[in-house]
Curated annotation (Swiss-Prot):
CDD domains, per the entry: ZipA
This protein's name: Cell division protein ZipA
Protein species of origin: Yersinia pestis
Subcellular location: Cell inner membrane
A Pfam family assignment: ZipA_C
Gene giving rise to this polypeptide: zipA
UniProt entry tagged with the keyword Cytoplasm: no
Subunit organization: Interacts with FtsZ via their C-terminal domains.
Alphabetized InterPro entries for the sequence: Cell_div_ZipA, ZipA_FtsZ-bd_C, ZipA_FtsZ-bd_C_sf
Chain positions covered by the region annotation Disordered: 61-183
Family label: Belongs to the ZipA family.
Segments of skewed composition (Basic and acidic residues): 61-72
TM regions (residue ranges): 7-27
Length: 328
């Protein structure tokens, strides 16, 4: 866009200059034609000057030299230095001849100027060339042409002044933009599992199991399994849960009297609500109570007999998760 605007200004300026030059040349032609019309007055003055010169020529006699080419400049190199009157007479005679020749060619010059090239307009030897720089019209043309040049930079720089505030506004708005929030680091979790199984490949009756589970503070709830809440009445967050050892792991309290299973599984998430160590201790006590009620045994997550070493392993896992989440 800026290049197109600059090109348009240059073309308009060039057209204005050419128009002003043509107008100035046309004005100078009119002035030359008016000068040619005034030539008869000059001829009358020159004829008056020729009269005393001719009388002087008659007094000199044969020493006078006339030239047949009035347009050529006289040469004084071949004249005798002792004769003082000859250069004066010869110069006067040559000047009179040039005046006569110019007066004869004046009508033709005035006619030819109408057909001559306006840039090469023929000028006589005595007429000084017209100074275009002194023409008042061309002086105005220079001023008018200089104005677009001074006016051009604002047009070119105007978009820059319009863009600058936008850049300044953007730079001010950048700090306001909300920084992307760092995603919180996911807490480390683990699942602790205990099993209550029947002895020697036996099964646990559903009715006995249901009574023991309810007496241990479990409530039937989501996913068709039993949950131990913070309150034995079933209120508060879930501390741990109990599911069937056989898939899909759910129960149906209405058909528990006709139900039997080789065992149940108890599990809790770490971290959990409250103290994880106390919640695990409560889950271990509930498992031991149910095992005593149904005549089963408590097994670890690998379905092996619970040992003191395995209990320490559970406690170590709880401490590891809690410490990792505390550092994070």
């Amino acid at each position: 866009m800026m290049q197109d605007l600059r090109l348009i200004l240059i073309v308009v300026g060039a057209i204005a200059i050419i128009a002003l030059l043509l107008h100035g040349l046309w004005t100078s032609r009119k002035e030359r034609s008016s000068l040619f019309r005034d030539r008869p007055v000059k001829r009358t003055k020159q004829e008056r000057v020729e009269t005393p010169i001719e009388s002087l020529d008659e007094g000199v006699g044969e020493v006078r030299v006339r030239t047949s080419h009035p347009q050529e400049k006289p040469s004084f190199n071949h004249l005798d230095d002792d004769d003082d009157e000859v250069p004066v007479i010869q110069h006067a005679e040559t000047k009179s001849a040039q005046v006569k020749t110019a007066s004869r060619q004046a009508p033709f010059a005035s006619v030819q100027t109408d057909y001559d090239d306006p840039l090469l307009g023929g000028l006589s030897a005595e007429q000084p060339p017209h100074d275009l720089s002194r023409d008042p019209l061309l002086g105005k043309a220079d001023e008018s042409y200089s104005q677009p040049q001074h006016a051009e930079p604002p047009h070119v720089e105007k978009p820059a002044h319009q863009v600058a505030p936008q850049q300044h506004v953007e730079s001010q708005q950048e700090p306001v933009a909300p920084a992307p929030e760092a995603k919180p680091q996911k807490l480390k979790e683990t699942v602790l599992v205990l099993h209550v199984a029947a002895h020697h490949g036996g099964v646990i009756g559903g009715e006995v199991l249901l009574q023991s589970v309810l007496q241990s503070g479990f409530q039937f709830g989501e996913m068709g399994i039993f949950h131990r809440h913070l309150s034995p009445a079933g209120s508060g967050p879930v501390l741990f849960s109990l599911a069937n050892m056989v898939k899909p792991g759910s129960f149906d309290p209405d058909t528990m009297s006709d139900f039997s299973t080789p065992g149940v599984s108890m599990f809790m998430m770490v971290p959990s609500y409250g103290d994880a160590n106390q919640n695990f201790k409560l889950m271990l006590q509930s498992a031991q109570r149910i095992a005593d009620d149904v005549g089963g045994v408590v097994l670890d997550d690998e379905r092996r007999m619970m040992t003191p070493q395995k209990l320490e392993s559970y406690k170590a896992r709880i401490r590891e998760v809690l410490d990792a989440n505390t550092i994070a």
